[in-house]
Amino acid sequence: MTQDELKKAVGWAALEFVTPGTVVGVGTGSTASHFIDALGSIKDQIEGAVSSSEASTEKLKSLGIPVFDCNEVDSLDIYVDGADEINGNMQMIKGGGAALTREKIIAAIAKKFVCIVDASKKVEVLGKFPLPVEVIPMARAYVARELVKLGGVPKYRQNVVTDNGNVILDVHNLAILDPAELENKINRISGVVTVGLFANRGADIVLMGTLDGVETITQ
């Protein structure tokens, strides 16, 4: 199976965790896109979705799935999204698609976070994939200097503006041995909106696409 076929397999496998009559939290990216396709097949069985990006919102609407504003829901039964990296503690790096802040908000609201990935995303130590940090534009240089102090090599993601009107710094050369601590440290830097470490609120269930099929991992 190709990598995209593995992504499709986990996207459709996630339907098993969707409760009829609920609003579903939906992520962003190539794997989440397959889940949206799958969700379209049961659109008459769900109330709708809350989306983490304009791109996902557009796709959901194109499939006839109602999209609710995050402020319209008190909680979500489930949030389904991919990851750029995930470790054995189900902590993740996310934000390759620049939707990390909205993804983190939806993860916080959701009772259950189902992470859908292909096996290539599994790592022992987070950090080989550059760590995205969403930053208010006027603070870009200051935040970059602070990230250097933490041992990283930040690079400005050119020609990218988030759905919130901010910029992204991708932090290279990190071996993240304590993801929760680093998440807290970076989030305390003035001008940081959020960091793409999902460590304090990790996944509850991981669906991992392998050549032998979809593996379900729980804590």
Swiss-Prot record:
InterPro entries: NagB/RpiA_transferase-like (IPR037171), Ribose5P_isomerase_typA_subgr (IPR020672), Ribose5P_isomerase_type_A (IPR004788). Homodimer. Keywords: Isomerase. One of its GO terms (biological process) is pentose-phosphate shunt, non-oxidative branch. It catalyses: aldehydo-D-ribose 5-phosphate = D-ribulose 5-phosphate. Transmembrane segments: none annotated. Coiled coil: none annotated. Pathway: Carbohydrate degradation; pentose phosphate pathway; D-ribose 5-phosphate from D-ribulose 5-phosphate (non-oxidative stage): step 1/1. This is Ribose-5-phosphate isomerase A. The gene is rpiA. It is an enzyme of class 5 (isomerase). Pfam families: Rib_5-P_isom_A. One of its GO terms (cellular component) is cytosol. Belongs to the ribose 5-phosphate isomerase family. GO terms for molecular function: ribose-5-phosphate isomerase activity.
